[in-house]
UniProtKB/Swiss-Prot annotation:
Pathway connected to this protein: Carbohydrate biosynthesis; gluconeogenesis
Activity regulation comment: Activity is enhanced by dithioerythritol, and is slightly inhibited by fructose 2,6-bisphosphate. AMP does not inhibit the enzyme activity.
Protein name: Fructose-1,6-bisphosphate aldolase/phosphatase
Species this protein is from: Thermococcus kodakarensis (strain ATCC BAA-918 / JCM 12380 / KOD1)
Thermal behaviour (record text): Optimum temperature is over 95 degrees Celsius. The enzyme shows a nearly linear increase in activity between 37 and 95 degrees Celsius, with a 6-fold increase between these temperatures. Is highly thermostable, displaying a half-life of 150 minutes in boiling water.
Residues that coordinate or bind Mg(2+) 3: K240, D241, D242
Binding-site residues for dihydroxyacetone phosphate, renumbered to this chain: H22, K136, R274, D295
Residues engaged in binding beta-D-fructose 1,6-bisphosphate: H22, Y94, G107, N108, K136, Q250, S251, R274, D295, Y357
Functional summary from the UniProt entry: Catalyzes two subsequent steps in gluconeogenesis: the aldol condensation of dihydroxyacetone phosphate (DHAP) and glyceraldehyde-3-phosphate (GA3P) to fructose-1,6-bisphosphate (FBP), and the dephosphorylation of FBP to fructose-6-phosphate (F6P). Does not display hydrolase activity against fructose 2,6-bisphosphate, fructose 6-phosphate, fructose 1-phosphate, glucose 6-phosphate, and glucose 1-phosphate. Exhibits only negligible activity on inositol-1-phosphate (IMP). Is essential for the growth of T.kodakaraensis under gluconeogenic conditions.
Similarity-based family: Belongs to the FBP aldolase/phosphatase family.
SS bond list: none
Induction text: High levels of transcripts are detected in cells grown on pyruvate or amino acids, whereas no transcription is detected when starch is present in the medium, revealing a sugar-repressed gene expression.
Alphabetic keyword roster: Carbohydrate metabolism, Gluconeogenesis, Hydrolase, Lyase, Magnesium, Metal-binding, Schiff base
Amino acid sequence: MAVGDKITISVIKADIGGWPGHSRVHPQLVETAEDVLSKAVEDGTIIDFYVATCGDDLQLIMTHKRGVDSPDIHGLAWKAFEEATKVAKELGLYGAGQDLLKDAFSGNVRGMGPGVAEMEITLRKSEPVVTFHMDKTEPGAFNLPIFRMFADPFNTAGLIIDPKMHMGFRFEVWDILEHKRVILNTPEELYDLLALIGAKSRYVIKRVYPKPGHPIPENEPVAVVSTEKLYEVAGEYVGKDDPVAIVRAQSGLPALGEVLEPFAFPHLVSGWMRGSHNGPLMPVPMHQANPTRFDGPPRVVALGWQISPEGKLVGPVDLFDDPAFDYARQKALEITEYMRRHGPFEPHRLPLEEMEYTTLPGVLKRLTDRFEPIE
């Protein structure tokens, strides 16, 4: 491989057993996944890999030359999750295999439970990439930070002072209820974009693309987010979606610091305990991504990489392992305390329409026959 060649970066994650409860991943699950992926490097299926964790989610980060949605790569991830699930069951871990919602692999893990973010890119002379991993929240949790990275000049100075970025970017937004998508240009359609993505439980940013004239081809994503909703697959609540994202940085794109800056504000996201509460998103190093207080607060980990000319993953650098984010963590804890004091009341608890796929309807159904008309 060399500069100018195509390479694919795949991040595929699943919750296949918590230790204990929903708090973290047992080390034996990581080792099992590493064994499966090591063999895949030896047989040439993938170029390189890293197995990360965030909360109770096992995260597979892989580079290869097989493109997005490759049955070989998705099948490999499924095998790693299946083998790790066997270990989880032997250990009696909580929710063993809970994100594997189908019995057999059918060529693509989309719609089978795991979350997927992938991009096929043309390698630049230097290719800095950040993978983001969230726990106890939903795909819409990325809306605000991705918007700020690529469309907010108060966050990203490059939008003002870098000629390569000054034209703005294109946002691919998915309506995850109607299964439709729209492409919006910024800054021209900024207000239209915000009208959609502010409703983060329905409209989610799936990809960001450069505009024509940018050094990066306009059909190559510069950011991609997993958008799988577990309840749409299972038909009931089986866990929160815990999204992942891949973001490219530098040289006509947001600088590394501009990619990380949105997370200095611990904005409110949906998820937390039983997937039913709003709470702050706390940026943490990987060793602190173990949600315990009320199964939270929700966490985000940022891993930094350089992709070598051979497609190797040079890293990771645990980017939130930095005292510069201590204030964000402290603020997140203050917000956590404030929100928890609401107990079962909104706005800490999600509104009823967002509780449809939780266990609450089963409770409310018992009261249906006891309601009577008000005269």
